[in-house]
């Protein structure tokens, strides 16, 4: 199969955000200072950890593109958001089902954390996907209603068919 054709028929994203278990991450010894920690005042236990590549110059020097990791120890959940630039030289392929594992492994190569890539792939739930091209599909009332549910401030928008070929 032609490599370009294979990737062009898949959904591709420029930015993704997903939620997974906090058990799927561990910090690398000696890199803890790159991560912001929040502590419970009474117990002294870490309640959350956060890495934001845009937070300061030191983080931007390590990760010159968008990467956000937030780990909540209390809820045992973790949110990760990154751009397709995490794919490095494969950036033009964008984030897809095929390149998502590579992006996670590249995140590990940054030296901030270790990830259980297989577990993340198994249990993650995406809550933000920036699509990079139109999706050809029939727009039914059910689909339009679902889009309303997944759109922030849904009361602000009214989905309507645009010349029977799209929505606005």
Regions found by a protein language model. Give the residues of each.
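Structured, helix-rich domain cores that form ligand/interaction pockets
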Residues: 1-168
């Amino acid at each position: 199969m032609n490599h370009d054709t294979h990737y062009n028929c898949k959904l591709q994203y420029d930015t993704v955000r997903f939620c997974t278990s906090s058990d799927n991450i561990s910090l690398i010894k000696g890199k803890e200072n790159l991560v912001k920690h929040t502590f419970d005042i009474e117990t002294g236990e870490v309640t959350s950890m956060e890495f934001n590549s845009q937070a300061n110059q030191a983080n931007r020097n390590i990760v010159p593109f968008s990467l956000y990791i937030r780990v909540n120890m209390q809820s045992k959940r973790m949110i990760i958001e990154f751009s397709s630039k995490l794919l490095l030289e494969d950036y033009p392929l964008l984030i897809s089902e095929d390149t998502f594992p590579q992006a996670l492994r590249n995140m590990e190569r940054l030296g901030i954390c270790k990830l259980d890539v297989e577990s993340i792939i198994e249990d993650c739930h995406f809550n933000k996907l920036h699509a990079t091209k139109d999706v050809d599909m029939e727009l039914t009332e059910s689909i339009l209603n679902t889009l309303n549910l997944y759109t922030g401030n849904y009361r602000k928008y009214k989905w309507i068919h645009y010349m029977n070929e799209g929505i606005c």
